């Protein structure tokens, strides 16, 4: 079982919060597409013997790609890998790209799940984030996707934006729930240095919300979405029954995945590979970076990903994979969190209750082996 990821780095406009690798040089799209086909051929042995169960186009803005280009990549991959049992093929999309004709083309290309970057239903907030669309366009995009036959749609929201909590956040939550999507990703804003928000913060013109506001907004999101029937199954992810994100689960559960495209990462459980974060270098065939994970690295990776999910750490599995001594040390470090209720042990698993996910980074850091 494995996942296949395609990174489409191109954007028409750079969002104020985004620190993913991206490029506005749309004239290079054809060159990157050709290089992605080349990389598929070069790395066909990476997934040999594996069944590809999920495929994902992320970015960037993958919805800038024509359906024919997406279909070409999927067909090429199917010639090299066993994709016959692929249960989920996702495309990240901006609302203003999703016309009726484009959506029909996506369906014909084999896309069966859309991840729509709504972020907010407040137009002033969207302007602050330098998003291309309006709230009305977001609503229209989801409705158009549903009319086109998409029955598995996830919508992205961002909270923790200074000045846009309270009623603004409530409008966004009510708005997304009114659309009848099956999955919602709600991310807390992180102000990264190499972003427009980060540069404004360095000049004293922008300040992240404080911890009290973060917790209040996190709980507002959690309480509102779970009350509407969504399961809070990972730090930033909520799903109706049967609609968890299968591809993202490959990251959280250590499943092997191959990343194709500029800045794409691959992981096989023991080694991590990453492509050049440069369109020009990628097109030129720059070699991938590589890191061989030590046993300690693999343990920390397991702790980090497992504690982001509602299932948490399987204590028996952890002992078998990493040794009883390592597990005992981790449980010693976990004792204060268990006493406070931040961590719980039930049915052989140690996990954070979803309402405590906001502090997961602090807990994970404390349990790391240094």
Positions of predicted regions on the chain:
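Immediate flanking context of iron-sulfur cluster ligation sites
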Residues: 1-8
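Short amphipathic alpha-helical interaction segments
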Residues: 323-338
């Amino acid at each position: 079982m494995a996942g296949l990821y395609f990174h489409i780095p191109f954007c028409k406009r750079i969002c104020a919060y985004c620190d993913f690798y991206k490029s506005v040089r749309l004239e290079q799209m054809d060159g990157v597409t050709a290089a992605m086909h080349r990389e598929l051929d070069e790395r066909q042995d990476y997934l040999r013997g594996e069944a590809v169960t999920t495929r994902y186009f992320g970015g960037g803005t993958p919805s800038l790609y024509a359906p024919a280009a997406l279909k070409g990549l999927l067909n090429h991959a199917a010639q090299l890998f066993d994709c016959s049992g692929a249960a989920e093929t996702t495309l990240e999309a901006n609302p203003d790209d999703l016309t009726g004709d484009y959506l029909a083309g996506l369906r014909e290309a084999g896309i069966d799940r859309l991840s729509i970057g709504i972020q907010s239903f407040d137009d002033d907030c969207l302007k602050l984030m330098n998003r291309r669309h309006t709230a009305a366009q977001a609503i229209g995009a989801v409705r158009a996707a549903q009319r086109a036959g998409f029955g598995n749609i996830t919508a992205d929201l961002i909270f923790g934006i200074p000045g846009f909590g309270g009623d603004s956040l409530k409008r966004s939550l009510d708005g997304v729930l009114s659309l009848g999507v099956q999955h919602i990703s709600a991310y807390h804003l992180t102000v990264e240095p190499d972003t427009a928000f980060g540069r404004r913060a360095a000049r004293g013109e922008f300040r992240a919300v404080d911890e009290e506001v973060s917790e209040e907004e996190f709980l507002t999101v959690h309480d509102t979405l779970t009350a509407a029937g969504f399961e809070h199954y990972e730090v930033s992810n909520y799903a109706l029954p049967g609609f968890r994100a299968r591809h993202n689960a490959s990251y959280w559960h250590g499943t092997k995945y191959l990343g194709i495209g500029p800045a794409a990462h691959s992981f096989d459980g023991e080694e991590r590979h990453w492509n050049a974060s440069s369109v020009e270098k990628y097109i030129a065939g720059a070699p991938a970076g590589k890191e061989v994970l030590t046993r300690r690295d693999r343990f920390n990776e397991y702790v980090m990903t497992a504690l982001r999910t509602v299932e948490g750490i399987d204590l028996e599995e952890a002992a078998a994979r990493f040794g009883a001594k390592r597990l005992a040390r981790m449980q010693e470090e976990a004792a204060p969190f268990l006493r406070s209720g931040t961590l719980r042990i039930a049915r052989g698993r140690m996990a954070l209750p979803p309402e405590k996910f906001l502090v997961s980074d602090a807990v994970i850091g404390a349990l790391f082996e240094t």
